[in-house]
């Protein structure tokens, strides 16, 4: 039996993107092991067939933590003798690629979900880019989640073209059309709008993801307030690095009765259905799974014109694009999309998600 190991820094990465694939492999003749920080929730979700081994992989830059993580991974890989080791997220990729190469694992795949250094500057950017280069060099193959980020990585000198691939049309695992079921849109829309106090006639802009600067939250709030309209704004996700947010705008948002800031949810498909237009104004993204998930249930989007999100849409048909970090352009697009046939754009988004990102095909 072939032995496969998946490595990530935090349990959330596995929970959000990889559980269906891990279960599929474990049920079809492979021994599958997951390595990341410990989580009771992840242990339960993986079930009995996927092995879970806990190793704390530090986030950020920590010399002592780095040495310890590499030593622990090396010892574990040497003991288990995996046939394939795959890793995602920058720190996990850096440590695991070094350890996997050290023990002679023949297949070392970097599942590259985005380039963190693009959001940094100065010495920090240089260090993070070097970490990416080392992880790529130590890997036997690199799997990018979007074609646009693959091309960016080649231009940036991270890897040669012959070493990298994108599976089908990209994404971390496609979209589960049984979960993100367009046929249930009207039902879910009514349920969630009722819970949130929205009427069916209310126009609702939505954001799903980490509520932090690099996701474009400052620009989204500024754009929303520029509109000065009766539209609602629903933000679904955990607040992260609140100090990076524009405090004046964020405090104003928390006091605005037309804005709801909601914790992350497990049934996000129902919230996508309650939204009229999804907004993803990120500064950087590996792909932008939220766009194809929302699209699958019939919700069009406005996204930053950057590598990653541009692979998730058919411009002008399923979504609009705007420059990153441009609040005025975003406000114009948010106002403009209400004048277009956004309902038909949503139908097109559902067809696009089904044709391009069905997880069963991927």
Annotate each language-model stretch with its function.
Residues 38-41, 138-179:
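A short, active-site helix/loop in glycosyltransferases that binds the activated sugar's phosphate group
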Residues 87-93:
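Short His-centered aromatic/hydrophobic patch
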Residues 191-194, 343-356:
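A short, well-ordered alpha-helix in the C-terminal region of glycosyltransferases
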Residues 264, 283:
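Aromatic "clamp/platform" in nucleotide-sugar-dependent glycosyltransferases that forms part
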Residues 314-316, 320-327, 335-340:
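Conserved acidic donor-binding segment of nucleotide-sugar-dependent glycosyltransferases
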